[in-house]
Structures are given as C-alpha cells and as structure tokens.
Amino acid sequence: MAKDFLLEVGIEEMPARFLGPALTQLKEQTVKTLQELRIEYADIQTYGTPRRLVLYIKDLAENQAALEKEVKGPAKKAAFDAAGNPTKAILGFTRSQGVSMEDLVVRSIGQVEYLYALKREEGRPTAQVLAEICPGLIAGLHFPKPMRWGELELRFARPIRWLLALFGEAVVPFELANLQSNRFTYGHRFLSTGDLSIANPEDYFTKIRGAYVLIDPAERKELIWQQVQELATAEGGVVEKDEDLLDEITNILEWPTALCGTFDEDYLKLPGAVLVTPMREHQRYFPVVSNEGKLLNKFIAVRNGTRAYIEIVTAGNEKVLRARLADAAFFFEEDLKQPLASKVNGLQKVVFLEGLGSIADKVDRIGAMADHLAETLGANEEQRENIQRGALLAKADLITNMVYEFPELQGEMGREYALRNGEAPEVAEAIFEHYLPRFAGDLLPETLAGSVLSVADKMDSIVGCFAIGIQPTGSQDPYALRRQALGICHMLIEGNIHLSLRELVQWAYQGYHEGVELKQDLNQVITEIEEFFKQRLKGILNDRGLSYDTVDAVLTAGFDDIADVVDRGMALAAFRELPAFAALMTAFNRANNLAKHATTTQVQEVHLEHSAEQELYGLLTKLEGEVRPLLEQKNYALALQKIATIQSPLDTFFESVMVMVEDEAVKTNRLALLKKLVGLSMNVADFSKIVVETK
C-alpha cells in the first residue's frame, strides 16, 4: 500500500533569491534518486518559504521494486570438463554470486557462449531507504553563498533548526546537523507560538496553514498580486506588474498582507526614477500610477503578518520611505548645483577594469569608435556632433550623488541632468540609451546616437576583456559579456543596421593604446570574438524558430554582417517550404560534392562540349546577372527563387554529362562550372549543411 511522504527542513530566514533554485534542485534530486532506487510514486511537489523547504511525495510505494539482473560468468566451454562436470571456474563463480547451478543461463556473445547468473534482489522497505537518503537530499542542495554554523562541517543556505520527516504516520528517523528528525514543525515566527505535532502529511497542510504559513509560493504570489491590485484600484490607480519584485516579496514572507501608504505630494516634482527606485529597489514597495501612467503619491507594501495594527505598520512604512525620499531629493538637488559636463574630468579617478585603464579612457575610446560608426552609417554633421557630445557625457553621471547611492539609475540620471543643463534632447537620450538593452527583453535604442554609442560601449568592453584574457567560462560571466554581445546583435538586427563584425573588433582593439598592455594580438581576438558572436547568433536564430541545419547553413555562408544573417535565415526557412526544395537540394549537394575537387571558377567556353553543359552555363551566366543585384538589395527570398530555376538544367547536366572524364581540360572546366554554381548560392547559405528528409 502506498503512503504519502513529507520532509520539511526548518531554517533561519534565507535570502529570497535562494528559495526558487533550492526547491527546483530538491525536486530534481528526489526524482532522480527514487528512479535509481526503484521506488514508485504518483507525484512529487516542493514548497517553501524563507523559513522552510518542503518535499511532498504522493502515494510513495512501501517497498522498492525487486531488481532482477544477469551477471556474466565464464565461457560455457570452460565451465564443464569433458565428462560434463562443473569445473572449479564455474563452481567458484556460483559461490561468489550466491546462486546454484540451476540459476545459470546461457547467453551468446558473437560466436562464444557464456554462462550468466540470474539474480533477484528483493526490494527493501521504503521507510529504511528514506532514512538513508534524506540527509543526502538536504546536504546536496547548492546555494550561491552557503554558510557554516557552530562546529558543523555542513554548509547550507542558513542554519537548519528542525527536521520533520513522516512516511504515512511514522517518523522517518535520520540525523543531520546535530538534529534528529521528528514530527514537529513551527508556524509563523510571530503569529504562532510553540511547536506543532503533525500526525501525517495531510495533517501538516492543515496545521501549517492554521499557523499562518502559506507554504506554496505560487499561492502566496497570486494572493499578493490580488491584494495589490485591489488596493491600487481603491486608490484610483494601477500598479505595473513587476515580476522580479513580486517574486522577491513572495519569497521573503509566509503570510502576506498588503497595505497602502502615502508620501508628500511635493516629492512628485522630482523625476519619476528618483522616486520609483527607492520604493522598488530599497523598500520593495509597488509604486502606484494613475490610469494615464502618472505617478501618484501612493505606494503599496506587503507585510509578513495579518491586518492587526495595520495602521501602525503603514505609518512605519511611510516614515521609512519619507526618509529615503528626503535623501534622494537632497542628492538630486546637490547634483544640479554643477553641470554634468563638470563631472567628466573626475572619471580619470574611476577604474574601468584592472589593466584596461580608467572610465575616462573608456570614454575616449567610445568617442573614437563612435565616430567610425557614424561615418560608416552616413550620419550627417549634426548627428555626428550629437554622437560625440553624447560619448563625452555618457559616463559622467557615474560620479553623481544619485548614481553613487542608486547605481541602477546610471543613464537615467545622466539623461535627466543633461536635459536640465540645456543639452540637446538627442544628446540626453543617447546618454540613457547607450546602456540599452540592460537585460533580456529590455528596450532597444531608438535613436541613431543611442545605437552608435551602445554598440561602441559594449564592443569596447568585449574586446578589452578578450584582449586581456577575461572570457566567459561555463556559467561564469562576471562582466556580462554574453549579455552585451546579445545586446549588440539585437540592436543591429532590429535596427536593420549593417556593420562588419570584424571591423567593429578592429576599431575597438585599436582604441587601446598607451598605458594598456593587451595579452592577445588582434587576429587572436578577432577569431575568438567571431566564435563568441557565432554562438550568440545560433541562439537568436533558434529562438526565431529556425531549424538547426538552417542555422548552420546561413552561418557557414558567413556572419560578418549580423543583421544580414537573420534576413538570410528567414528567407531560407521560407524557401524550404517549397515543394521542389528536396529535389533541388539533392542536385545541389551532388554539385557541391564534385565542386570540392575544383581548383578554379573560370569556365572556358571552348571546353563546353555537350549541349547540357552549354545550357547550364548559359543559364548560370544569366542568373548571375539577375541574382547579384538582388543580393546587393538583400532581397534573399527572390534571389533564392531565381537560383531554384537552375534545378532542371542541372538535373539534365548530371543525366547527360560525365564530370570526372579523362580529358583533364574538360574535367577541370566542368568542375569549375559546378563550383561557380555552388558559389552563387553560398552568398545566401551553404546548402550542403541542409538535411533533406527522405520519405
């Protein structure tokens, strides 16, 4: 008969970011362990709060499934003597395996027969197995910053304070961290007193809820959002759903109750970011805005408790926020006493990265590279002036009071101060936009100046890090180089900006000169960064639904122009839907295999002996004239359609002409013809990478 199993690990409050990954690990480890141990179950769920991790297994079998296995023994011919009697070899084997001669079977491996012992290992009681595996399931959880406590060797998110383990109504006995498992748990730290004796897993869920603990993070999150929306509506406003903030609040409490507070309307004169950042980032409050999106002097907080004394709690939150906003207002006013441009010289004292100079050096490099980009993209004089001014001021807000106190406001405060200093709106916007995108799914720059500065800034960081040997490895990417590379890719793709990746790397590399010692030469850096971007592009193309072989085909054909890669990939994906595509690929792959032997693409008409090759050459010459302009216009869909028209004459060519003939001149000419044909398609994709499914 199956029983439910419950494991609860009671701990001191852990950081919010630890909870989700811990519950995922706990479930995955349990699934893997039970599978290896042959213990069946109906369902596994994990729950948790900052004070507890809970594992619940529904209908866990009372015993392991029996294990039947075969153990290879000696060859049959070595197991019996001439009279058919067992030899010492087989007797020793049966004795070592604990089986009799009747438990042996014959199995053939190639031409040789071997004796195998049939063994059956009966399953052990699940209760015994659970007692053995529970310590490992808990100790096997990994946290970003585990800690030790007391004299223990165990490392965990926070000190473990109790262990509850029940299989049905029985305690599963084990010891960990000098604690013995039992049937006792504890409710909310302040709303529940004393321990709770749990009869069985079902009893746990009833009693823990009665002790003001909602153990299901999904339920807490839903309840919090519902309360927040109701309070915002009651105040005539709305709250923008911030998933990160919502998740963080969900994971720092056990019994959520939302409340609405207010602050002085005078603070609404400050820029919105100056108010929202302290609320969200420091106090974990939800700002309330009007239906038109205008910030109101309201905020919504969530307490870990009931509505008892809610007025006092609200007043306390208002007092704390009032102090935060007063500080922010002071910093803002102090920053305005000097123009943003006056901060630029101070950047010489701010280190960019050890070995790569100061932020002032980086600003100079960004300006130089931005000028290359502006010229390449055909920016007019006014645009180039705005780009250079934006480059000069891009990092100036790093040494303002506001950004020192709230680093996440870099760029936003630079834009605000630039506007108040009378800088051109295009310059101010570029200061903000050069940080975009900051994370997956973030905004992209909308202005030319913002895009140029963003690409220059990010490429400078990527090239500098690669040049001194700092590269992302595995899950480690301390300088967010992957994110910055993805940002460049998305900007170029979405903005339809056509630039050479190789030139970008060269320009950035050349910006590092006096006082900077680079460990790798330019060619090394180009090679490594090209591969780095290639991997990012693979992910982008896969996310757009392109098959792996379509991705390989377009990337093999080249990816120096990043925006161009996506255009070619989407055109090829659509081209693959044509009914005749498979037949075309068959012909092209045959041509490609032969073209590998070619040493030239120069076709000598005098050696075109057969009408089929003459017809193919004539059509190819005509197609080159039609396709080249389409490629220049990046009209890859039409270019591929034109290329497809060569299938029929190509099929005729292969049916009528022998390529690898003895006449060297004729053979060379035919190979050149095929190489020329394959080269035309290589402007879009390498068709040899396409996998054609045969039916």
Swiss-Prot record:
It comes from the Bacteria. One of its GO terms (cellular component) is cytosol. Belongs to the class-II aminoacyl-tRNA synthetase family. Its main location: cytoplasm. The keyword Translocase does not apply. PANTHER family: GLYCINE--TRNA LIGASE, CHLOROPLASTIC_MITOCHONDRIAL 2, GLYCYL-TRNA SYNTHETASE. This is Glycine--tRNA ligase beta subunit. Its EC number is 6.1.1.14. Keywords: Aminoacyl-tRNA synthetase, ATP-binding, Cytoplasm, Ligase, Nucleotide-binding, Protein biosynthesis. It catalyses: tRNA(Gly) + glycine + ATP = glycyl-tRNA(Gly) + AMP + diphosphate. GO terms for molecular function: arginine-tRNA ligase activity; ATP binding; glycine-tRNA ligase activity. The keyword Ligase applies. One of its GO terms (biological process) is arginyl-tRNA aminoacylation. It comes from Desulforamulus reducens (strain ATCC BAA-1160 / DSM 100696 / MI-1) (Desulfotomaculum reducens). Signal peptide: none annotated. It is found in: Cytoplasm. Tetramer of two alpha and two beta subunits.
